[in-house]
């Protein structure tokens, strides 16, 4: 018996170099130019990836909506239940180290030649315990732990997406509110222009065509006002869904939150920080880690499993009276099962596990590349919109002067109604575009917040 134990111990030590005991080594190297060659990086603690959402989105009303969404959103609640499922699986993997017990009481009654019935009772308890010499249970536990962390990363990704979606929808409403205010103001101004043109026609300084053209443009603006109101209603409904509520009007401040719009640039931190900050990148690495341990499990299937089993129980002797105190029976067995040929299933399973591990590795690499690309796009979007805003301000200032001059010239009969119409229409489009560009600037901030992992809790 001692020789057998020594033999098994030596075999276990020999096989420890075969890969079934190795642990996954987390990724620690990320290309310095992951965000793009033109993006300067710095290892700073105040980069946007380390800020909480409250520090980025400072509008009090928006903060209320985000907190409400974090409490009620159904997608986030589903992600929380997914974490609970993974926690249960992790607990099961931990308990696999413990022995199993089974109790199966039995009773029989028999008689011979119409004699007195004889009752027999048996109360057996069976136990078995797998000794994890070859790492099957250990690797299963490590895989379950990786999957648990992945479920937590998924929950964080859903949370980050929810915060970004609420912020994006809220600022969409503010953009539409501003565009609606501009359109309503223009509608009123255009009505005054129509009345002025009609007065000029009555004075012989304009014709019917001018009045009709002015009216047509005025009606176009009226319909655009209705379109904007419809869009506002649709966006409010979308935000209500994010808050897990039925459609209703959303109260808002009506002003732009510009606390971060005044920055010349955003510090984004160094790319390696994304491994810790961005949940989808972490999740992709957890998938790789789980696949790594699944491959280890597939390798361990080639080695024997050692199970200690035993049983103990009480039975009364057959043919004795019911008051017989009975007998105690106990047995113990150690078994070793060595797989020899399983129709190629173990070999096939190992090949599948290795292939899935390579797939997970490529997915992780692609997740990193996607993340770097998203950071680059968000930075460029923000900076481009910020640069454009300078020119939009100058354009609107020039168009206001042009409209004022053209209107005066028309009143004195020195220009046509078409020039006034063109000046007013161009000014309206420029003002609407300026508001949309301001929204694009804020979108860049939101996208950057999400691209860098959603900040800290």
Walk through the language-model features, giving the residues of each.
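A small-residue-enriched
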Residues: 18-36, 67-132, 230, 236-251, ...
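Regulatory alphaC helix of protein kinase catalytic domains
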Residues: 40-68
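Periplasmic alpha-helical coiled-coil/stalk elements that build and connect Gram-negative outer-membrane
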Residues: 146, 153-270, 381, 385, ...
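Sec-dependent bacterial lipoprotein signal peptides
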Residues: 1-16
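Coil residues (strongly favoring Ser/Thr
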Residues: 7, 44, 257-258
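Short segments within alpha-helical structural elements
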Residues: 220-248, 394-452
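Sec/SRP-type N-terminal targeting helices
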Residues: 78, 94-95, 131-159, 209, ...
């Amino acid at each position: 018996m001692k020789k057998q134990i020594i033999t098994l111990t030596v075999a276990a030590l020999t096989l420890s170099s075969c890969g079934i005991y190795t642990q996954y080594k987390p990724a620690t190297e990320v290309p310095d130019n992951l965000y793009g060659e033109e993006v300067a990086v710095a290892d700073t603690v105040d980069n946007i990836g380390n800020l909480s959402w409250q520090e980025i989105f400072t509008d009090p009303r928006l903060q209320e909506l985000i907190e409400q969404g974090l409490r009620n959103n159904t997608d986030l609640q589903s992600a929380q239940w997914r974490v609970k499922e993974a926690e249960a699986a992790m607990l099961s993997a931990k308990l696999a180290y413990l022995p199993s017990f089974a109790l199966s009481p039995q009773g029989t009654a028999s008689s011979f030649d119409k004699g007195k019935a004889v009752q027999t009772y048996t109360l057996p308890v069976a136990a078995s315990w797998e000794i994890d010499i070859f790492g099957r249970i250990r690797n299963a536990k490590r895989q379950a732990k990786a999957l648990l962390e992945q479920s937590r990363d998924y929950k964080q990704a859903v949370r980050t997406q929810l915060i970004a979606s609420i912020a994006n929808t809220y600022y969409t409403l503010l953009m539409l509110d501003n565009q609606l205010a501009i359109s309503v103001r223009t509608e009123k101004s255009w009505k005054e222009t129509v009345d002025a043109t009609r007065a000029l026609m009555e004075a012989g300084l304009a014709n019917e065509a001018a009045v009709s053209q002015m009216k047509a443009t005025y009606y176009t603006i009226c319909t655009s006002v209705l379109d904007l109101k419809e869009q506002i209603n649709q966006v409010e409904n979308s935000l209500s869904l994010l808050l897990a509520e039925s459609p209703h009007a959303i109260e808002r401040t009506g002003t732009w939150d510009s606390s971060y719009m005044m920055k010349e640039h955003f510090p984004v931190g160094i790319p390696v920080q994304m491994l810790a900050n961005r949940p989808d990148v972490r999740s992709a690495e957890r998938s790789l880690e789980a696949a790594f341990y699944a491959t280890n499990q597939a390798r361990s299937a080639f080695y024997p499993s050692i199970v200690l089993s035993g049983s103990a129980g009480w039975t009364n002797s057959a043919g004795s009276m019911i008051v017989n105190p009975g007998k105690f029976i106990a047995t113990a067995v150690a078994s070793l099962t060595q797989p020899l040929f399983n129709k190629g299933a173990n070999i096939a399973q190992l090949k599948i596990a290795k292939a899935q591990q390579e797939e997970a590795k490529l997915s992780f690499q692609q997740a990193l590349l996607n993340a770097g690309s998203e950071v680059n796009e968000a930075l460029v979007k923000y900076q481009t919109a910020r640069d454009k805003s300078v020119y939009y301000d100058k354009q609107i200032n020039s168009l206001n002067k042009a409209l004022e001059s053209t209107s005066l010239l028309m009143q004195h009969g020195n220009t046509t109604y078409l020039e006034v119409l063109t000046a007013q229409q161009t000014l309206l489009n420029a003002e609407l575009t300026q508001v949309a560009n301001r929204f694009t600037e804020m979108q860049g901030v939101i996208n950057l917040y999400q691209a860098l992992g959603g900040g800290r809790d």
